[in-house]
Amino acid sequence: MRLQFNPARAVSTGARIDAAALKARPCFLCAANRPAEQTADLRFPGYELLVNPFPIFSRHFTIASLNHEPQAVTGHGDDMYRMATGMPGYAVFYNGPRCGASAPDHRHFQAVPACELPFLASGFPFRTIEFKASDADSARRMLDDTLASLPGEAGEEPMVNILAAASADNITVRFIVIPRRAHRPACYGTGDGEHLVSPASVDLAGMMITPRRHDYDTLTGDDIAEIIAQVCYPL
């Protein structure tokens, strides 16, 4: 596990995602509310490929739906497949609405260089569900079957983070589904003895983001292990 001190991520890490907060702010993924400088690439049907304005890595993209619709991945495994094969060398990921998405009211994915995520190569130290798909339809079907097998509240998507990366042949895509047991750890906060850490896909793939210098300097291996144990399921 690596740590990154990134104060620009404080907005995302500390985002309020309750209904009142979402209603009170304009959606920053809708085209009408984005800066004019944030131009879009339309290579993926139904989506806009955008440079993330608060990047974790030097190459970090957000892939936002053209429509303002809730963050949900059921029925969209084919989209993830096309994104992964359309961006070789990148890991495309999805943060569920209670699993790190700072815009749970607008469906979006993100993409970062796969080589920056240590656990993709070394393996994940907590429970994951993995499968490989060789076409978009299979990806959608297998992802939907996986989601249907997970526990969740009636009418709501299971709590998950999902990563997808194409293999060297750029045909087979590896999907890693991370079931979540909690949105944030018990230590989440800015008070004494607390840490402003809210794990999402990048954190759980081996690069934990710390917006505060205090957390970067004081988090121990045991602290990180406990944070992961509280938000993920054990092997």
Task: Outline where the language-model segments fall.
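Active-site microenvironments that recognize anionic phosphate/pyrophosphate groups
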Residues: 1-78, 90-99, 114-133, 139-235
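Short glycine-biased active-site loop of nucleotidyltransferases that positions the nucleotide triphosphate
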Residues: 101-104
